[in-house]
Amino acid sequence: MHHCKRYRSPEPDPYLSYRWKRRRSYSREHEGRLRYPSRREPPPRRSRSRSHDRIPYQRRYREHRDSDTYRCEERSPSFGEDCYGSSRSRHRRRSRERGPYRTRKHAHHCHKRRTRSCSSASSRSQQSSKRSSRSVEDDKEGHLVCRIGDWLQERYEIVGNLGEGTFGKVVECLDHARGKSQVALKIIRNVGKYREAARLEINVLKKIKEKDKENKFLCVLMSDWFNFHGHMCIAFELLGKNTFEFLKENNFQPYPLPHVRHMAYQLCHALRFLHENQLTHTDLKPENILFVNSEFETLYNEHKSCEEKSVKNTSIRVADFGSATFDHEHHTTIVATRHYRPPEVILELGWAQPCDVWSIGCILFEYYRGFTLFQTHENREHLVMMEKILGPIPSHMIHRTRKQKYFYKGGLVWDENSSDGRYVKENCKPLKSYMLQDSLEHVQLFDLMRRMLEFDPAQRITLAEALLHPFFAGLTPEERSFHSSRNPSR
């Protein structure tokens, strides 16, 4: 009789007492999502044909949203971005982060290890030994080979695949220790750098859980973790699609303003909690913001003469804490995914919590219009776009930066007659000109975004202040309340 395979773990990894210091590369762009997927990496922008420059901005955004020249070799890939399975995400993450790292001598062969089959109950032990007769197996890249019907830890039964990325894979499981509740299990590759990044993320998630016992602050909930034969595994609550994936599947039709308002309020609420606990996320983007439930209804838009998907419930969770940094920790020079990276990071002036506020401003614009505000992957062009949209960079920031190669006599060095110069000139305009309507609530949204997109981080609005902004006066009492969810403990 055929038996499904049950895996048991060796002794838990004793890293809980590990005092950690974050180590990241000097130049990192981790763009990577549980149901959580990653970004494509198209050819470098300089290699495009001249005909490409004539592609409309929104279409070019869809095709080249994710390119960048920065690399990150020592981060935890996006929780929301690499899993919950967007093909866009997986393609980009593979091209970005698959490097010459190998932890075994024979990198091109599968690796098998025998499992243990000990159990406290004798009958359970006999069943376990039969189901563990097959070896634990890794593929050539260190991914755990597992199938629907397999078990891990005599607890998690795999019932579906949610996605695979550079860091590993995510599978949907039934947690038999908790009444067959559904969870998303993130299984990290058996590779040292990813294992270490997962340990750092687990420590951050544990700190968040300690501070938010009732799960009122909308951060993704870790319910369990364990080391399975070198694979760090993290169990999370099962959530819906990430907000970028939903946007993409809706043909990049922007979210309605009431949806933008509710998601913005939740984002400010969640990130204020992190900031008050001396933690900066550093990698906020639509991929790392997940719907609790992404069920939708299809509506006909008479104005656009097309059908649109409208999510039924705009409750969200913030995910991917693999790069989150406490105030007392070392702050690397480069943080944040390119499109959401603030000027102080590009100019290497140092960063803190206002870094997240800038990212939220960029995210809100993307929700509102359906495309990124700063569609670029090069520092100089990025700064030029900022000036075209937001006005001149403050002189004191120019004087302080070490990146003087971008400036001459206090101004950006830029050729407006080049193909890149023409592109920026044609497609970047003052922020308010992107408003779809002149009604009060649209004006209020753009006022909030402009305050979040202040060049000087010292002048940028704080999230405590943002929550009091008039834009949020239109929220319903239900939207202002945050219902606690079940918070399972280890």
Curated annotation (Swiss-Prot):
<dbReference type="GO" id="GO:0043484">
    <property type="term" value="P:regulation of RNA splicing"/>
</dbReference>
<feature type="modified residue" description="Phosphoserine">
    <location>
        <position position="9"/>
    </location>
</feature>
<feature type="binding site">
    <location>
        <begin position="162"/>
        <end position="170"/>
    </location>
    <ligand>
        <name>ATP</name>
    </ligand>
</feature>
<feature type="domain" description="Protein kinase">
    <location>
        <begin position="156"/>
        <end position="472"/>
    </location>
</feature>
<dbReference type="GO" id="GO:0004712">
    <property type="term" value="F:protein serine/threonine/tyrosine kinase activity"/>
</dbReference>
<keyword id="KW-0418">Kinase</keyword>
<feature type="modified residue" description="Phosphoserine">
    <location>
        <position position="76"/>
    </location>
</feature>
<dbReference type="GO" id="GO:0004672">
    <property type="term" value="F:protein kinase activity"/>
</dbReference>
<feature type="modified residue" description="Phosphoserine">
    <location>
        <position position="78"/>
    </location>
</feature>
<dbReference type="GO" id="GO:0005524">
    <property type="term" value="F:ATP binding"/>
</dbReference>
<dbReference type="GO" id="GO:0016301">
    <property type="term" value="F:kinase activity"/>
</dbReference>
<feature type="compositionally biased region" description="Basic residues">
    <location>
        <begin position="88"/>
        <end position="116"/>
    </location>
</feature>
<feature type="active site" description="Proton acceptor">
    <location>
        <position position="283"/>
    </location>
</feature>
<dbReference type="GO" id="GO:0106310">
    <property type="term" value="F:protein serine kinase activity"/>
</dbReference>
<dbReference type="GO" id="GO:0004713">
    <property type="term" value="F:protein tyrosine kinase activity"/>
</dbReference>
<feature type="modified residue" description="Phosphotyrosine">
    <location>
        <position position="7"/>
    </location>
</feature>
<keyword id="KW-0067">ATP-binding</keyword>
<feature type="modified residue" description="Phosphoserine">
    <location>
        <position position="49"/>
    </location>
</feature>
<comment type="similarity">
    <text>Belongs to the protein kinase superfamily. CMGC Ser/Thr protein kinase family. Lammer subfamily.</text>
</comment>
<keyword id="KW-0829">Tyrosine-protein kinase</keyword>
<dbReference type="GO" id="GO:0005634">
    <property type="term" value="C:nucleus"/>
</dbReference>
<dbReference type="GO" id="GO:0001669">
    <property type="term" value="C:acrosomal vesicle"/>
</dbReference>
<feature type="modified residue" description="Phosphoserine">
    <location>
        <position position="135"/>
    </location>
</feature>
<keyword id="KW-0968">Cytoplasmic vesicle</keyword>
<comment type="function">
    <text>Dual specificity kinase acting on both serine/threonine and tyrosine-containing substrates. Phosphorylates serine- and arginine-rich (SR) proteins of the spliceosomal complex. May be a constituent of a network of regulatory mechanisms that enable SR proteins to control RNA splicing and can cause redistribution of SR proteins from speckles to a diffuse nucleoplasmic distribution. Phosphorylates SRSF1 and SRSF3. Regulates the alternative splicing of tissue factor (F3) pre-mRNA in endothelial cells.</text>
</comment>
<keyword id="KW-0597">Phosphoprotein</keyword>
<feature type="region of interest" description="Disordered">
    <location>
        <begin position="1"/>
        <end position="138"/>
    </location>
</feature>
<keyword id="KW-0808">Transferase</keyword>
<keyword id="KW-0963">Cytoplasm</keyword>
<feature type="modified residue" description="Phosphoserine">
    <location>
        <position position="67"/>
    </location>
</feature>
<keyword id="KW-0539">Nucleus</keyword>
<feature type="binding site">
    <location>
        <position position="186"/>
    </location>
    <ligand>
        <name>ATP</name>
    </ligand>
</feature>
<dbReference type="GO" id="GO:0004674">
    <property type="term" value="F:protein serine/threonine kinase activity"/>
</dbReference>
<dbReference type="InterPro" id="IPR011009">
    <property type="entry name" value="Kinase-like_dom_sf"/>
</dbReference>
<keyword id="KW-0723">Serine/threonine-protein kinase</keyword>
<dbReference type="InterPro" id="IPR051175">
    <property type="entry name" value="CLK_kinases"/>
</dbReference>
<feature type="compositionally biased region" description="Basic and acidic residues">
    <location>
        <begin position="26"/>
        <end position="56"/>
    </location>
</feature>
<feature type="modified residue" description="Phosphoserine">
    <location>
        <position position="51"/>
    </location>
</feature>
<keyword id="KW-0547">Nucleotide-binding</keyword>
<feature type="compositionally biased region" description="Basic and acidic residues">
    <location>
        <begin position="63"/>
        <end position="76"/>
    </location>
</feature>
<dbReference type="Pfam" id="PF00069">
    <property type="entry name" value="Pkinase"/>
</dbReference>
<dbReference type="GO" id="GO:0042802">
    <property type="term" value="F:identical protein binding"/>
</dbReference>
